[in-house]
Amino acid sequence: MGLMNAFDSQTEDSSPAIGRNLRSRPLARKKLSEMVEEELEQMIRRREFGEGEQLPSERELMAFFNVGRPSVREALAALKRKGLVQINNGERARVSRPSADTIIGELSGMAKDFLSHPGGIAHFEQLRLFFESSLVRYAAEHATDEQIDLLAKALEINSQSLDNNAAFIRSDVDFHRVLAEIPGNPIFMAIHVALLDWLIAARPTVADQALHEHNNVSYQQHIAIVDAIRRHDPDEADRALQSHLNSVSATWHAFGQTTNKKK
């Protein structure tokens, strides 16, 4: 089928002026791959292709849309990034449902760009504080004995990793991940994983010796958080969590200042 651009006939000379000095301009033409992507996305959302069903072959899509193979492949790759199709080597694309990870993943590029701007890290740290504050309050009020045992196990691994910075960072992330798992909401999990990934990637490189003291402080603060959750005291759990994250934020800010002075 032919795909026409609705704005092909516009020209700058014939367009009226708007505002004080602005003249309207022709909008950029869409690529064929973008038009194919949009049409396939609408077909999927209209349930013309159900979840788990295979799309037509590349050759069939080329004939249907009257486009070349590169346009079809670019369109399918874009749909894959949106979580609308799965593509395995040698097989036709199969319709899938976007997961929470897919939704958050679409924001990753924008988030990393935001973090690189002045104040970006501080804003994300505040977001993490608000988010995890709700998580620990929920955990203190609703965590089962089994979930508290998982926190205790994560804490034990934390204690065994104090002298190995790479291992401690992993155990630290795992500890906070267990907190995020307690409500059983996959969106919370996806947000939490992404937040930590973005913040950790933005942290400066620090000498191992400087991190050892920080590891011990974080571990003691983790103990306070778990103790409050075990006592089912949401206010104390919140205070312990806020003390911990404010301490982490201040420590990494100081590390960053030191690193910048050395440059």
Curated annotation (Swiss-Prot):
Please give the superkingdom of this protein's source.
Bacteria
Q: Where is this region: Disordered?
A: 1-22
| GO process terms (BP) | negative regulation of DNA-templated transcription
**Which residue ranges does the record assign to the HTH gntR-type domain?**
30-98
Gene Ontology molecular function, alphabetical: DNA binding; DNA-binding transcription factor activity
> Hey, what's the signal peptide range on this chain?
none
Q: According to the UniProt record, which residues make up the DNA-binding region?
A: 58-77
InterPro entries xrefs: GntR_C (IPR011711), TF_FadR/GntR_C (IPR008920), Tscrpt_reg_HTH_GntR (IPR000524), Tscrpt_reg_NanR (IPR023730), WH-like_DNA-bd_sf (IPR036388), WH_DNA-bd_sf (IPR036390)
| UniProt keywords, alphabetically | DNA-binding, Repressor, Transcription, Transcription regulation
PANTHER family xrefs: HTH-TYPE TRANSCRIPTIONAL REPRESSOR NANR, TRANSCRIPTIONAL REGULATOR, GNTR FAMILY
| Purpose of the protein | Transcriptional repressor that controls expression of the genes required for the catabolism of sialic acids.
Q: Name the protein family.
A: Belongs to the NanR family.
Q: What is this protein called?
A: HTH-type transcriptional repressor NanR
Q: Which organism is the protein's source?
A: Escherichia coli (strain 55989 / EAEC)
